[in-house]
């Protein structure tokens, strides 16, 4: 884990992702419904990284707020996202919005407290959790610290607002990140 710490903490600025030393940019889909944007964004990741998708893991510092409203989606979409939301809570990928995480997000206490982070190596759920963070952002999911990290390719992707994904190179060679963003454009 020490080698990963070198990548994470030197290359990702947790206070301002676009100020990260390896920040390359972000992509988003235009003129689509929110649901379409979310799904298209994940499909782009799956398509581009199809040969290395299993090398990704998820690093989050997200909280849940059960009292918040649900965004306007179809009944089928709400059913899907509620299922993912409950699974994320059960797996500890979303933690209760209180204590240290509340202090961090409410008072902007820095530096970023590493002990509020969660990891998931469950390949079948990591993209669903990213989609959830976009769909329920500013509602039932609190925070925006959600990273898909591929240590082999030395790249970190994060849900960018509710429109796509941002891209941070975890090495001085940004070519893979640039190639990915060009693929998405």
What are these regions (language model features)?
Residues 1-164, 169-185:
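Structured alpha/beta or helical-core interaction and ligand-binding surfaces enriched in interleaved
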């Amino acid at each position: 884990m020490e080698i990963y710490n070198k990548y994470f903490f030197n290359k990702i600025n947790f206070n301002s992702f676009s100020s990260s030393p390896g920040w390359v940019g972000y992509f988003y889909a235009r003129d689509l419904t929110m649901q379409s944007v979310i799904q298209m964004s994940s499909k782009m990741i799956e398509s581009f990284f199809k040969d290395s998708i299993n090398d990704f893991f998820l690093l989050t510092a997200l909280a849940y707020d059960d009292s918040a409203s649900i965004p306007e989606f179809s009944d089928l979409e709400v059913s899907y996202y509620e299922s993912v939301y409950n699974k994320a809570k059960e797996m500890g990928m979303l933690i209760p919005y209180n204590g240290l995480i509340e202090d961090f997000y409410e008072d902007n206490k820095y530096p970023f407290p590493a002990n509020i982070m969660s990891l998931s190596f469950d390949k079948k759920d990591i993209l669903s959790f990213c989609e959830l963070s976009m769909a329920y952002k500013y509602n039932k999911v609190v925070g925006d610290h959600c990273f898909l990290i591929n240590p082999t390719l030395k790249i970190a992707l994060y849900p960018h607002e509710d429109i796509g994904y941002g891209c941070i190179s975890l090495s001085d060679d940004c070519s893979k990140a640039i190639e990915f963003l060009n693929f998405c454009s």
